[in-house]
């Protein structure tokens, strides 16, 4: 019974993580959705993030326990930075909301928009690094199957190279360091290209 419970918990965690990433990628293409749908998707994302945090609360409890290796230190820095970026994203979302949280009438839309632009960019980068770290155990399992190991390595290198290309081509660094106040959407391009 206990094993079944652990498997169920692990499955739910994986579903939440996949759903979070897919929703966030969709939200990055803000010009494809109406404001209302964008905000509701964002609200769903933050609900999933809260669930994700609850499921992984033991990790926070273990922060000040045990020895810190370089790998653990790197993981902790990325996770804490991701938490901070997500919190900034949540707060800024409420400040700029024109639909879901408009009834709060908090004001601060100008600073909220700036914070939202920068924090979402950092969330995207940190979330990708976070996922990369959690894929490491799966990569270790591939060592038993050499044919899959090399295939996996080639795919990983190609994805990393494409990621660097897109990062530079779309000037993503401008959003990370607030070098631009606007995110442009090329309507001549297929919408599908913005998800790659």
Short names for language-model regions:
Residues 2-196:
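Membrane-embedded alpha-helical bundles that constitute the cytochrome b-like, heme-associated redox core
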């Amino acid at each position: 019974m206990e094993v079944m419970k652990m498997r169920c918990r692990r499955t739910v965690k994986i579903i939440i993580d996949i759903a979070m990433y897919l929703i966030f990628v969709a939200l990055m293409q803000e010009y494809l959705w109406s404001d209302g749908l964008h905000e509701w998707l964002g609200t769903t994302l933050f609900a999933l993030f809260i669930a994700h945090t609850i499921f992984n609360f033991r990790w926070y409890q273990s922060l000040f326990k045990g020895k810190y290796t370089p790998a653990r230190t790197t993981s902790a820095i990325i996770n804490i930075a991701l938490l901070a970026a997500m919190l900034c994203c949540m707060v800024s979302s409420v400040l700029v909301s024109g639909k879901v949280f408009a009834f709060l009438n908090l004001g601060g839309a100008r600073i909220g928009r700036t914070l939202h632009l920068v924090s979402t960019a950092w969330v995207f980068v940190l979330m990708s690094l976070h996922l990369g770290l959690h894929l490491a155990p799966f990569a270790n399992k591939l060592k038993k199957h050499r044919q899959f190991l090399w295939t996996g390595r080639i795919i990983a290198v190609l994805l990393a190279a494409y990621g660097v290309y897109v990062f530079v081509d779309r000037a993503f660094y401008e959003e990370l360091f607030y070098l631009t106040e606007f995110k442009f959407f090329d309507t001549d391009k297929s919408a599908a290209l913005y998800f790659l």
